[in-house]
Structure formats: C-alpha cells, structure tokens
C-alpha cells in the first residue's frame, strides 16, 4: 500500500480540521512549491525528514536490452533524496517483511 496525496489531504481534513477542498489545495500547493524550487535549481530541505537535491549525470554508454545495440544515454539532471537522521531512526528498527 502507498501513501497518496489524497491520503494526505484526508489526514489534514481529519486532524487539522481543514475543509476537504482546502486540505486538497494545501497538499497540491505544498508539492507545487517543492517542484518549483527543484526546477529553479534550489535544494529542498525538510527539517526532520530529509533533503531533495538535483544531481547532474553525464552522458554514458548504454545498451538496448532487446537488441544488444550500444546506445548513448544522454546527460541529464536527476532528483535525489537523502533522508534525515530523524527519519532514518524511525525506520531503521522496523521489522523486515519477507
């Protein structure tokens, strides 16, 4: 099961008392701010949670798995996430599902 934006909005509705419309809008605005910051090259730091960064990946050789043909993988920018210590501590000791 995955946590969705709808789940976050529902939690805001239940725990904070926002209307469903305001809760949904708050979640949308939150994620839009993160997207805009990353698009403009800024780091996103969420205290107690972690950091989102942009990393440059240079061009590298690749291979088409179906044909075996060598193809270049173009240079690109990727988003990385580094969890903060508090988040790491909360999930570190969770039991491992098999």
Curated annotation (Swiss-Prot):
**BP GO terms, sorted:** DNA recombination; positive regulation of metabolic process; regulation of DNA-templated transcription; regulation of translation
The entry's cellular-component GO terms read: cytosol
Using the UniProt annotation, give all residue ranges assigned to the region (Disordered). Answer: 53-73
Q: Which keywords label this protein?
A: DNA recombination, DNA-binding, Transcription, Transcription regulation, Translation regulation
- Which PANTHER family does the protein's record reference? DNA-BINDING PROTEIN HU (PTHR33175), INTEGRATION HOST FACTOR SUBUNIT ALPHA (PTHR33175:SF2)
Q: What is this protein called?
A: Integration host factor subunit alpha
Q: Mind telling me which Gene3D superfamilies this protein's record contains?
A: IHF-like DNA-binding proteins
State the similarity comment.
Belongs to the bacterial histone-like protein family.
Species of origin reads: Aliivibrio salmonicida (strain LFI1238) (Vibrio salmonicida (strain LFI1238))
Which SUPFAM superfamilies does the record cross-reference, listed alphabetically? IHF-like DNA-binding proteins
List the Gene Ontology MF annotations in alphabetical order. DNA binding; structural constituent of chromatin
| Taxonomy, superkingdom | Bacteria
Composition-biased stretches, type Basic and acidic residues, lie in: 53-69
CDD domains of this UniProt entry? IHF_A
Q: Does the keyword Transmembrane helix apply?
A: no
* Job description of the protein: This protein is one of the two subunits of integration host factor, a specific DNA-binding protein that functions in genetic recombination as well as in transcriptional and translational control.
- What gene makes this protein? ihfA
* Summary of subunit composition and partner proteins: Heterodimer of an alpha and a beta chain.
């Amino acid at each position: 099961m995955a946590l969705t934006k709808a789940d976050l909005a529902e939690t805001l509705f239940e725990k904070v008392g926002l209307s469903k419309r305001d809760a949904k809008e708050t979640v949308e605005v939150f994620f839009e701010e993160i997207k805009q910051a990353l698009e403009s090259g800024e780091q996103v730091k969420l205290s107690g949670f972690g950091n989102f960064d942009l990393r440059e990946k240079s061009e590298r050789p690749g291979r088409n798995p179906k044909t075996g043909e060598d193809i270049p993988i173009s240079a690109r920018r990727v988003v990385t996430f580094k969890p903060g210590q508090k988040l790491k501590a909360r999930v570190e000791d969770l039991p491992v599902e098999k």
